[in-house]
């Protein structure tokens, strides 16, 4: 009889342990899914070290790894924690970088220009073309639902001044050298340049 009671207690303990294991796994799986959604909802225009596609792929891989795991081990929990903390760092980052972005001319034709950019966390990017002609922001214009990021050039004068001031204060010391290199690269794509006329 004592053996029967002992075995019954063990079965009960195993059921409780299994329920706890499943609840922990479900919670981590849910959190990994939320993290993936947060990354997908962030700005795709980022400096190379915060590559959007690589971050989405890493979060997707982690979510799938958690889903296929039988239990949550410390290594899996550490992997989630490091990814979560990295995304928190990106969300508060203001980083200066250069990018070749689509802009529109007076005839509403789209073409690409090099621009200096300032990342405002993972929700927007300020930009100014290196020739200084176009100033604007890249942000989510969707009121609700899936994110829809667009380049906005039609900013008012006050916002334009604020964007230029933010970009100017974020410039690194070697800013002028990088701009000179990008201006040379821009000549390759300029249809009015001698290089394009020759070819």
What are these regions (language model features)?
Residues 1-88:
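Charged heptad-repeat coiled-coil "stalk" segments of single-pass membrane proteins
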Residues 6, 20-21, 49, 54-58, ...:
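Arginine residue identity/basic-tract feature
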Residues 24, 31, 94-97, 142-143:
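General N-terminal targeting signals
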Residues 62-115, 119-123:
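Soluble extracytoplasmic domains of inner/organellar membrane proteins
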Residues 98-100, 104-199:
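Long mid-to-C-terminal scaffolding/interaction modules that assemble large complexes
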């Amino acid at each position: 009889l004592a053996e029967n009671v002992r075995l019954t207690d063990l079965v009960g303990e195993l059921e409780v342990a299994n329920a706890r294991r499943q609840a922990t796994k479900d919670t981590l799986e849910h959190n990994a899914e939320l993290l993936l959604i947060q990354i997908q909802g962030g700005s795709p225009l980022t400096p190379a070290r915060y590559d959007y596609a690589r971050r989405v792929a890493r979060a997707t891989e982690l979510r799938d790894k958690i889903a296929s795991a039988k239990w949550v081990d410390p290594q899996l929990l550490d992997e989630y924690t490091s990814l979560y903390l990295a995304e928190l760092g990106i969300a508060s980052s203001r980083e200066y970088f250069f990018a070749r972005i689509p802009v529109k001319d007076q005839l509403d034709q789209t073409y690409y220009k090099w621009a200096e950019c300032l990342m405002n966390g993972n929700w927007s990017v300020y930009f100014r073309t290196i020739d200084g002609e176009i100033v604007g922001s890249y942000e989510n214009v969707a009121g609700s639902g899936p994110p829809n990021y667009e380049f906005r050039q039609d900013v008012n004068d006050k916002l334009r001044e604020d964007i230029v001031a933010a970009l100017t204060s974020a410039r690194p010391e070697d800013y002028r050298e990088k701009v000179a290199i990008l201006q040379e690269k821009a000549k390759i794509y300029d249809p009015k340049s001698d290089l394009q006329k020759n070819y």
